[in-house]
């Protein structure tokens, strides 16, 4: 077979219409073989003829899309010094843009001899490893444009491609559980009904089903076990796995964009599926273990583990950083995605041992003209020391606000001494973000996410019920800040069911009407349950799949209406923090942009906030006090609102503010009823009864 020198850049397999350039980085390689596989699995080995700056490369004319390939890296095998080359192991290209097949767990996948890890395993792993695929980069995007939705107009919907669509009978059978199914008209209609402007997809990079799960008859459902940072997982494709998955993913993005919906990817750049020192050799470990992974200093056979998965990517190494940045740029420029949610993002900031917001990774993102312009969302923690970094990411980043989740849960389950922090969380968490010149939209607000209870389970279970995971119910978070409303799990008690429904409305209304960016877990709007399992990482079955035949239509309708209320009124989605403080203003001064009231109509004092037993408060939002301006520089104004929160177990009479705040009000939302309230008039200083554990919203009409 004819081989030309080719080029060291770009890395990976790049088809140009006449042939394909192959390039692979390895500082430790002594020789690199490109291995081509035909449809029968027959292997043809070709030495890459050139090496330039530790990048091995060659060009093969007439090799095109659909060609399956892998690499064999010849080099030193000395685990004690962190060297793990073994040419008997076929290796996936870290830059593979498509991957065909699944890991077939076999002893040959492990580079070491099971009797002595210092000896290499000489069995050939090629028959048991998936193959990289050369892809056709050309796609008809038509008039596709990124929606470019501002954060303060964004509503995020966290979704699992398969779990959301697999049981939806409005989607053709062959498309359920796939990229094509996610952008089916029935799904787009559902998103639009909820006011969703961005879907945040749980991991769609090619991932591996863990060996331990396979032995227990389970599968990796969530997908946080990546092996290909450029390849959309082929299991979510209805059209094929020899490159068709790339085209299908692009089609999904194009269709969602046409509907005005952005696509955000949950990405896992902190570790790979190769695990710890006892794990398999699938890709980077056999290519250049020292460059790609953080090794224990002085004990290089072992891996630093800040992720709880066995290894940590070495973001201190320039080629590992390049891999991550190249992957991010590829997904933006070639796949047209609109942003990323970075799993365990604190790990990416660990240049040495501590989390450093000035790390090279953040510097590279900041100066990159492509990546810096999309939505960047951090999961601001990892499992290492000092890993909890909520509020500490650089200014252009937003963060999953775990403190919002915890505080809102505590408030609505009636925990004492939460009122002051609750007020801060629903106003954008200024204590976390204002000091670094960030805006309220730095806070991605959520009550539930994939990791933990669904909203229905949050109000139905006090304890986790993870027995189906096969770990003796030891896995998963034990401190859930949940309340079952009186009975653990499912019940036919109508009073308890009504209270649970009301609590769900409380959470949804609080989420959508808080300052910041709301994120809704898929199915929470429809009553999805996981039967009390709060760690469904391995449940690819009806425990996690959304049951479209039994939707809570009332809750869907309520969610849609509250989302519309947020959309229609910029006072609920300000771009700047409030200036008002919970103290009385002076005579003759204009109304503050926000004012807090006790149930008897007094402005809250410091003593009121410090009371450990307060569970109710009224909040005045001044529609004339919005400091934001529109694109033409015109001042934004809105109606004023009063929001009344009552987390007590009994009803409370609230006195509405004096006439200077508004002479006439209408109740537009009351979570004590399943439907959005019919406008009910109320004059200034009217006494309004707010039911136990409910939220009421009043709009000023005069």
Regions found by a protein language model. Name each.
Residues 155-157, 199, 263-265, 340, ...:
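Hydrophobic faces of well-ordered beta-strands that scaffold small-molecule active sites
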């Amino acid at each position: 077979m004819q081989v030309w020198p080719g080029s060291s850049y770009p890395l990976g397999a790049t088809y140009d219409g006449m042939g394909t350039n192959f390039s692979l980085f390895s500082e430790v390689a002594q020789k690199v073989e490109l291995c081509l596989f035909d449809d029968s699995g027959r292997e043809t080995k070709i030495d890459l003829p050139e090496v330039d700056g530790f990048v091995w490369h060659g060009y093969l004319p007439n090799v095109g899309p659909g060609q399956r390939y892998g690499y064999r890296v010849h080099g030193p095998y000395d685990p004690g010094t962190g060297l793990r080359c073994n040419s008997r192991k076929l290796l996936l290209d870290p830059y593979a843009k498509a991957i065909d097949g699944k890991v077939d767990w076999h002893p040959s996948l492990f580079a070491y001899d099971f009797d002595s890890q210092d000896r290499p395993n000489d069995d050939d792993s090629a028959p048991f490893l998936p193959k990289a695929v050369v892809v056709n980069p050309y796609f008809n995007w038509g008039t596709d444009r990124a929606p470019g939705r501002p954060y303060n107009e964004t509503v995020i919907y966290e979704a699992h491609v398969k779990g959301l669509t697999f049981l939806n009978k409005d989607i053709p059978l062959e498309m359920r559980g796939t990229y094509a199914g996610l952008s089916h008209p029935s799904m787009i209609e559902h998103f639009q009904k909820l006011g969703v402007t961005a879907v945040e997809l749980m991991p769609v990079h090619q991932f591996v089903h863990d060996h331990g799960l396979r032995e227990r008859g389970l599968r990796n459902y969530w997908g946080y076990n990546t092996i290909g940072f450029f390849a959309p997982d082929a299991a979510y494709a209805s059209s094929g796995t020899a490159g068709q998955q790339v085209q299908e993913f692009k089609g999904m993005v194009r269709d969602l964009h046409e509907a005005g919906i952005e696509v955000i990817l949950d990405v896992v750049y902190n570790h790979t599926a190769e695990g710890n020192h006892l794990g398999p050799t699938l890709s980077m470990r056999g290519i250049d273990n020292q460059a790609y992974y953080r090794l224990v200093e002085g004990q290089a056979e072992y891996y630093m583990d800040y992720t709880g998965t066995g290894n940590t990517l070495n973001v201190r190494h320039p080629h590992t950083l390049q891999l991550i940045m190249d992957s991010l740029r590829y997904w933006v420029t070639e796949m047209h995605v609109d942003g990323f949610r970075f799993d365990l993002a604190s790990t990416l900031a660990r240049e040495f041992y501590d989390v450093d917001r000035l790390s090279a990774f953040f510097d590279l993102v900041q100066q990159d003209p492509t990546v810096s312009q999309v939505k960047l969302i951090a999961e601001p923690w990892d499992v290492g020391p000092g890993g909890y970094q909520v509020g500490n990411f650089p200014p252009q980043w937003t963060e999953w606000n775990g403190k919002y989740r915890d505080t809102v849960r505590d408030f609505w389950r009636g925990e004492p001494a939460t009122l002051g922090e609750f007020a801060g969380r629903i106003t954008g968490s200024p204590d976390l973000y204002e000091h670094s010149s960030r805006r309220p939209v730095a806070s991605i607000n959520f009550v539930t996410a994939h990791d933990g209870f669904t909203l229905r389970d949050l109000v139905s279970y006090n304890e986790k019920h993870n027995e189906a995971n096969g770990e003796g119910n030891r896995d998963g978070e034990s401190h859930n800040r949940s309340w079952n409303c009186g009975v653990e799990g499912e019940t036919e008690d109508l009073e308890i069911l009504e209270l649970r429904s009301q609590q769900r409305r409380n959470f949804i209304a609080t989420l959508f009407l808080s300052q910041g960016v709301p994120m809704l877990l898929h199915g929470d709007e429809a009553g999805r349950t996981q039967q009390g399992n709060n760690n469904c990482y391995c449940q690819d079955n009806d425990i996690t799949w959304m049951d479209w035949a039994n939707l809570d239509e009332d809750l869907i309708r309520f969610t849609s209406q509250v989302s519309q209320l947020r959309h229609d009124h910029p006072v609920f989605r300000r771009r700047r923090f409030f200036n008002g403080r919970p103290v009385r203003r002076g005579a003759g001064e204009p109304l503050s942009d926000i004012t807090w009231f006790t149930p008897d109509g007094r402005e809250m004092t410091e003593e009121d906030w410090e009371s450990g037993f307060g569970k109710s408060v009224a909040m005045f939002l001044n529609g004339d006090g919005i400091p934001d301006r529109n694109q033409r520089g015109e001042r934004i104004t809105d109606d004023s609102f009063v929001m009344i929160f009552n987390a007590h177990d009994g009803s409370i009479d609230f006195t509405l503010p004096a006439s200077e705040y508004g002479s006439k009000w209408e109740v537009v939302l009351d979570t004590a009823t399943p439907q959005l309230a019919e406008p009910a008039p109320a004059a200034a200083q009217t006494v309004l009864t707010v039911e136990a554990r409910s939220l009421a919203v009043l709009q000023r009409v005069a």
